[in-house]
Amino acid sequence: MQDARRAGIAIVAMVRSSDNLTTRALRIIPDRLIVHNEIIQNEASSLYGMKAERITVVGIPHYDKYFRGPTVPRESFFRKIGLDPRKKLVIYFPICDYRMRENVVDRMVIETLANLDANVVVRFPPAESVTIAGLVKPPAMIFDRPGYVFDERIYGNRELTPEDDERLLHLLAYCDLVVAGPSTAAIDAALFDKPLLLVDFYPTTLAEAEKIYEYGTEHFSPILASGGARRAKSRDEFLSRLHEYLTHPELDHAGRARIVEEQCWRADGRSSQRVVAELLAALGHEGA
């Protein structure tokens, strides 16, 4: 971007995630900025002084394919990856190590979910560490570790494949509950109208600074305010909410719809087309 600015070349930038403008920063202000939703649009204006006419809201391009839905029937998909089609499915997206000074949560949650009479898939992040040292994988639980590894010696040197993304689409489409921390998994769950249970309890008493910090961040506050997720602050509450959601998946439907409206802006599967249209406009090819 620096070289482009020096050379007088127009810069079109895109915000790739909901936390980019508040937990990171724009060092160079582009000529035009593409964003997912009006929340990020307002952040670009209030935090960076960008004029509204230089910001284009397009939705979330990554979700375009999700609107077509699964291509493999539920029973066939379950059997393919080793799940029992007769049982419900819970997906756990780990908290990850970087969200705490010491990750004492992920192992605790996995051990708790192992006692469920349900299918449980732990969907690990492709490029973040998750400490579960000493944990023996429960036999009825699947550990899904996505990503093509480029170099085993460098942690995180991997990239999601189309097959990884397709598997996630099917897991989300067919699951009955999503358990997660303050991550984009909350939007994933809402997009498929799946109950969302947020983990905010710990095996021992911790100081506030040692807990999961992102629940207090600006980018996650709209999720908490939406009414589309329950935040468990004790093991008993976690188990109670878990069974409540599995019995009544319709709970908090309106809140999940609000998450989709606020975070995805348009749920029409055409976000990528709007990105292309913006780039063509920047090149002077409007309507091409």
Each model region followed by its residue ranges:
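C-terminal alpha-helical cap of glycosyltransferases
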Residues: 268-288
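Active-site and donor-binding regions of nucleotide-sugar-utilizing enzymes
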Residues: 1-68, 96-99, 128-129, 167, ...
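Catalytic binding pocket for nucleotide-activated donors in carbohydrate/polymer assembly enzymes
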Residues: 28-30, 50-52, 177, 184-266
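Flexible glycine/serine/alanine-rich "lid" or loop that lines and gates the nucleotide-sugar donor pocket
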Residues: 6, 173-174, 191
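Conserved catalytic-core segment of nucleotide-activated headgroup transferases in glycan assembly
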Residues: 63-158, 232, 264-267, 271
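Hydrophobic beta-strand scaffold residues
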Residues: 9-11, 120, 196
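Acidic donor-binding loop of glycosyltransferase active sites
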Residues: 157-164, 169-183
